[in-house]
Regions:
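N-terminal membrane insertion elements
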Residues: 1-45, 49
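Metal-dependent catalytic cores of enzymes that make or break cyclic nucleotides
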Residues: 28, 35-42, 46-63, 67-270
């Protein structure tokens, strides 16, 4: 082989050195990029954590506002704070045992306290009357369902949409003799059927200025007798199957301190 055909060793060495230097620069650049990416990632994680905390605070403020609106509707009722917590938790338990998805259970938990928000529009002379209402007064009282639904209508918030359904339908009856529309059977939204039973049970078993609470056994008998009349049979069955849990909720709320009662979002979450 002739000498001229051999590769220039010095040239090859220079090229290899240049390649090595270039690779080192690329490696260093990638290391710096990796550090920058890691720093950016850590910053994003911090932003995400801060955002999650802000969202949680906003949600709790939103739920607390809902609770206070519900309280405003029944402000003169000394038991209303306990009532809306008990009733909402009864609703959530029934919904869960009926097999509703977790998100729907949460919605009814947070929406049901607004079932009587329309009472804001009912005159105190009727709302606070301790004796039996006249026929005319009762017709006025019944309008709280429509007033409540109107107050809650046209919201894009899912919880308020559920609350609207409950407000308008929780006094409907399975046999069609309820109000305001005289709906029957499955015409009544499920959330209204659930809230209607929970509301009646809590009213029966709670002390009011005009009555003593019914004994639990008697209240349960009334609920069972109204199966297929006032109440959805399936809702009654689930309610009675889980009466021990219902009574546990009642005991927890009745024995809770004032701090627990004042924080609805915290109370229902616990």
């Amino acid at each position: 082989m002739e000498k001229d055909n051999l590769p220039d060793a010095s040239l090859t060495s220079n090229q290899l050195q240049k390649y090595a230097e270039d690779l080192a620069k690329v490696y260093q650049s990638e290391r710096e990029k990796s550090k920058d990416l890691e720093a950016a990632n850590q910053q994003l994680l911090k932003y995400a954590d801060d955002l999650n905390k802000t969202v949680l605070e906003l949600k709790e403020a939103y739920l607390d506002t809902i609770h206070r609106l519900a309280l405003a509707a029944e402000y003169k009722d000394e038991d209303t704070g306990e009532h809306i917590i008990r009733m909402s938790r009864y609703c959530a338990l029934i919904a869960e045992k009926l097999g509703l998805p977790a998100e729907e259970v949460k919605n009814i938990l947070y929406a049901s306290p607004m079932h009587d928000i329309g009472k804001i529009g009912i005159p105190d002379t009727i709302l606070m009357k301790t004796g039996k209402l006249t026929e005319e007064e009762f017709e006025i009282m019944k309008t709280h369902t429509i007033i409540g639904a109107n107050l809650l209508a046209h919201s894009r918030a899912e919880i308020l949409q559920v609350a609207e359904q409950i407000a308008i339908s929780h006094h409907e009856k399975w046999n069609g003799t309820g109000y305001p529309k005289g709906l029957s059977d499955d015409q009544i939204p499920l959330v209204g059927r659930i809230a209607g039973l929970a509301d009646v049970f809590d009213a029966l078993t709670s002390r009011r200025p005009y009555k003593e609470p019914y004994p639990i056994e008697e209240a349960c008998e009334i609920i069972k007798k109204e199966r297929g009349k006032h109440f959805d049979p399936d809702v009654v069955d689930v309610f009675m199957e889980n009466i021990d849990e219902i009574l546990k909720i009642k005991e927890e709320v009745d024995s809770a301190d004032n701090a627990l009662r004042s924080g609805f979002a915290r109370s229902v979450r616990d």
